[in-house]
Amino acid sequence: MSKTLHIICHDVPWPADYGGVVDLYYKMKALHEEGIKIKLHCFDYGRGRPAELNKYCEEVNYYERTTGWKAVSLSVPYIVKSRANPLLLGNLLKDEHPVLMEGIHCTAFLRPLLERNRKIFLRLHNVEFFYYSQLFQSERNLFKKIYFLNESMFLRQYERKLPDNLPVLAVSNNDAVFYKEELDKRLAIYLPVFIPYTQLNCAEGIGTYCLYHGNLSVAENEKAVTWLLNKVFSLAKVPFIIAGKDPSDRLIRKVKRNKNTSIISNPSTGELNDLVAKAQIHVLPSFNKTGIKLKLINALYNGRHCVVNDEAVEGSGLEDACHIGTTSQAIASIITQLYHHPFGEEEIGLRKRLLGQTFNNKENARQLIQLIW
């Protein structure tokens, strides 16, 4: 008998070009390959309605997101309230199939569905209130800082009040443990993120520069780059390339003032892949302990040495594949040591074992199917 699953996504998951939709797109693809029929529900606010999604979905439903003051509530986070479209609830109530909610964002109709004894599963992208607290600390714009702080406070209460019997599927072991121990959600488990990579493509030998890549329009990533410029590459005198989407004018000016450093704005997919492959060291610190860092997974599958701080890998299972520095001085020292050190078979073998055990889309899809049915 065929199995059908509703999936609610906070955004249109194609192109799969950022963390929140990479996991969903490749999860959807893996479920389809296991014979699951998917009814996709997503909120369209600028990414269009791509035909690509029809390859894996029995049906695709698009909804408008309410924005501005109409989505402001004194009890529900904005990211949730703005997606409380009644058309979505109407479509979900047309049958009795289980529902996978992709992120806290998509939980507006959680309780009405549970009251009807529907099987509901929540995919947790981050511990959202902690993530928004980190965004508050990284943001410079006063209006955005106020928004992130308020949203973090609302999310803290909202996440704590989620039903205790709700199965929660976290993308990192740390997040699963936090939900279990701090929020008393006993059904929280770790389900690894679904990824686009099926095999390692790391070049042996020595590359020619250090690389940081990421969405540079995100305040958290700009903070990481600024920290690297001020604290790390002022000590490690080696070529440093920063590549990513929409860097601010402020960041571009800062990079230009730093010797041995350059910035590549909005590289194409091919250009970014080439940069990742040719780098000697991927320097990818984070100041956010929650979630999983997909840019680090990209570097581990397709690049040479990876240097990180504790926050970037804690609870991820990726610690053994990375060089970890606890301070800026330690990271600079590791970079200096590795810059002329060839990347070879031993490191590749370690990554094959570590990554292959964890990020297996087929096995993880089968685990998800067993959980749901």
Predicted regions and their residues:
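Conserved catalytic-core segment of nucleotide-activated headgroup transferases in glycan assembly
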Residues: 23, 190-257, 262-277
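A charged, aromatic-enriched C-terminal amphipathic alpha-helix characteristic of glycosyltransferases
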Residues: 83, 342-373
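Donor nucleotide-sugar binding/catalytic pocket of nucleotide-sugar-dependent glycosyltransferases
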Residues: 148-200
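Acceptor-binding helix/loop patch of EC 2.4 sugar-transfer enzymes
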Residues: 67-76, 118-154, 215
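Membrane-proximal helix-turn-helix segments that form the acceptor-binding/catalytic region
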Residues: 26, 87-93, 128-131, 139-168
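N-terminal subdomain of nucleotide-sugar transferases
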Residues: 1-58, 94-96, 234
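Short hydrophobic beta-strand element within catalytic cores of glycosyltransferases
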Residues: 295-301, 305-309
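Acidic donor-binding loop of glycosyltransferase active sites
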Residues: 277-291, 302-305
